Amino acid sequence: MQNPVPPPDVEITVTSFLEAVRLLRDMETEAQTPLRAKDPIFMARKKQIETYISVFLKSVEQKQPTFKLLETPQDFKLPVKAEVIFQDSVHFYEALKLSFGKGGIYIKTDMHMPIDSLLDLKVTLLAENVTFKVAGKVIWVNPRATQGRPAGLGIKFYKLSPLQRQVLEDFMAGLLPPDALPHLSE
């Protein structure tokens, strides 16, 4: 059951980034009702949550995950084992936010790989002690920081089952905690 958005006379306390994402999603849904859409206090609170999320993401924006190949590729047409280590779920969320609309993840790295390279990714979120595996394909490369986007690789997830896609969508919506992400390996 979803928690309703607190009434205007109740102070909102946010204890985690993902809780803020979940609250914003609920507020966006509620803002579509005629009563809330015209409520200036509600809209101001929604703006506060949006600002909190934006500031938080800006603080992690410059931090780069560790990305390394676990084997020397002989042929980039065959999947290459690789590992990406994020400090925590917020950094993973930020990487998904940059490319999940396109069905993948953006990994900030100075490493270059050919377009269409196949990857068997092992993803680790250090703070939460969560590890999972997912298949990916390099769909674009940004060799150096340009147009506000850091150097890195755009990786499209492939072979995702409907359940795995739902796990990622629910995580992005703040509905699932990071410890549910190992279901992606199934």
Q: Which positions does each model-derived feature cover?
A:
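Short beta-strand segments
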Residues: 93, 130-134, 151
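Short, charged beta-turn/beta-strand-edge "cap" motif at the junction between a beta-strand
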Residues: 124-129
